[in-house]
Design a protein with these regions (language model features):
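Anion (oxyanion) recognition and catalysis
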Residues: 32, 119, 147
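Acidic pyrophosphate-coordinating catalytic loop
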Residues: 48-49, 164
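A short, GP-enriched loop/loop-strand-helix hinge that lies immediately N-terminal to
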Residues: 12, 93-137, 152-158
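Active-site nucleotide/adenylate-binding loops and adjacent lid/helix of ATP-dependent enzymes
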Residues: 2-10, 14-15, 21-22, 90, ...
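N-terminal phosphate-binding or glycine-rich loops at protein starts, especially the Walker A/P-loop
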Residues: 2-45, 53
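N-terminal glycine-rich "phosphate-gripper" loop used for MgATP/nucleotide binding
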Residues: 43, 49-119
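Hydrophobic residues within alpha-helices
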Residues: 23-27, 114, 142
């Protein structure tokens, strides 16, 4: 049986980095090694891509995975047909990836950026496409799309950071009015 090459992306430059590491540990421990060649690629908080050189996934949540002596720098090329690039000394090894499983949370993971890279590279991936990811990440845009589609949802009010900084009292009044009107519907 021919195994499918699967790249599991985890970590990321996001406040959700630690959550992603815990999620990736679970996903990687439950993948069938008889069916898949697994390429676990972690993205550090600084944005470095590292092919994790071990199958001891318990080291992911603790951060110990970063110290594995078999780790190698890696990247997914946006050029179609290049796949996963693994850097070993002066050499670059190409591994064709059949599918990517992004186990990334938050900004730069669920917002369409990784999905856009994978679309450029022509690599299929698990999860929503670029536009759906971007819309879902922006809560205001999600609410506007849901409103436009007639989806029932709780009343909401957009408050921008600058409004809170410059006009806090007016924001409080608007919020109080919104709550009162919601209670009387």
């Amino acid at each position: 049986m021919v195994k499918l090459n699967v790249c599991v992306l985890f970590g990321g430059m996001s406040p959700e980095h630690a959550v992603s590491l815990r999620s990736a540990e679970s996903v990687l421990n439950h993948m069938d090694k008889e069916k898949y060649n697994i390429f676990p690629v972690g993205i550090t908080k600084d944005g470095d891509w590292i092919l994790y050189g071990s199958t001891d996934y318990s080291k992911l949540p603790t951060g110990e995975w970063l110290n594995c002596p078999n780790n190698r720098r890696a990247a997914i090329s946006p050029i179609r047909g290049q796949g996963l690039l693994i850097f070993e000394g002066d050499c670059v090894i190409r591994e064709m990836i059949e599918i990517v499983f992004p186990v990334l949370h938050g900004e730069n993971g669920e917002d369409g950026t990784i999905q856009g890279l994978l679309e450029l590279a022509g690599i299929p991936y698990v999860g929503p496409h670029v536009a759906a990811s971007a819309i879902a990440m922006d809560k205001t845009l999600t609410k506007l799309v849901a409103d436009n589609a007639g989806v029932a949802q709780a009343d909401w009010l957009l408050v921008r950071d600058t409004e809170v900084s410059n006009h806090l009292q007016q924001v409080i009044i608007r919020l109080e009015e919104k709550v009162k009107s919601s209670l009387h519907q």
